[in-house]
Design a protein with these regions (language model features):
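Second-shell loop/turn segments in exported
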Residues: 99, 109-116
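Short, charged, surface-exposed loops that flank catalytic or proteolytic processing sites
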Residues: 116-124
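A contiguous strand-loop segment
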Residues: 2-106, 126-176
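A structural signal for well-ordered alpha-helical segments within the folded catalytic domains
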Residues: 107-108, 121
Length: 176
């Protein structure tokens, strides 16, 4: 599994939130950093957004983001947006059944939250609502089948949360 860490302002020498993530994806999988400017959409022309496996409703405005993502996937393993919102994704293995087709990957959810949310709390609320409406799933492996549920570490300059998920179930805790 990957590692994502956060040090909250109460525990850093300079009083700043620190966020870091590594990746343990396939060593041959191309992954790159991508900067995507903020954008306005005409919902009459573009009512939906195609994710890796499914489409979801588009919004009128998306925020500027920088993400690290596998080349073949719409979503991202880690990223941040113009408001200083940071999110990292982890694989979670549970007894809950996996949706092997037509699901939303955790990496897709991560990118959606960065594009649509201004704060850690807003991203937490967005992700928990989204998980209840859209099934997690789809192959997340490069060159092989790999299915899992997701955990997210979500942080902005003042708040941090851990969100653990399995299917439509979720639980979160604020990081002190």
């Amino acid at each position: 599994m990957c590692d994502t860490i956060v040090a909250t302002p109460a525990y850093t020498k300079n009083g700043k939130m620190l966020f870091a993530k590594n990746s343990d994806r396939s060593p041959n999988e191309p992954q790159f950093l991508q900067h995507i400017p903020a954008k306005d959409y005409d919902l009459q022309k573009t009512p939906t957004l195609a994710l890796t496996y499914v489409a979801v409703p588009q919004v009128e405005h998306t925020f500027e983001i920088t993400i690290s993502r596998p080349s073949w996937m719409w979503g991202a393993e880690f990223g941040f947006n113009e408001f200083g919102l940071n999110i990292g994704n982890e694989a979670v293995f549970t007894k809950e059944k996996y949706v092997k087709t037509d699901g939303v990957t955790g990496m897709d959810m991560l990118r959606l939250a960065l594009e649509r949310c201004r704060s850690a709390k807003e991203a937490l609320d967005f992700l928990t609502d989204f998980i209840e409406k859209y099934p997690q799933g789809g192959n997340c492996g490069y060159g092989k089948k790999f299915y899992y549920h997701n955990s997210f570490l979500i942080a902005d300059s003042s708040d941090a949360y851990v969100l653990e998920t399995a299917g439509k179930y979720w639980v979160w805790k604020k990081v002190k």
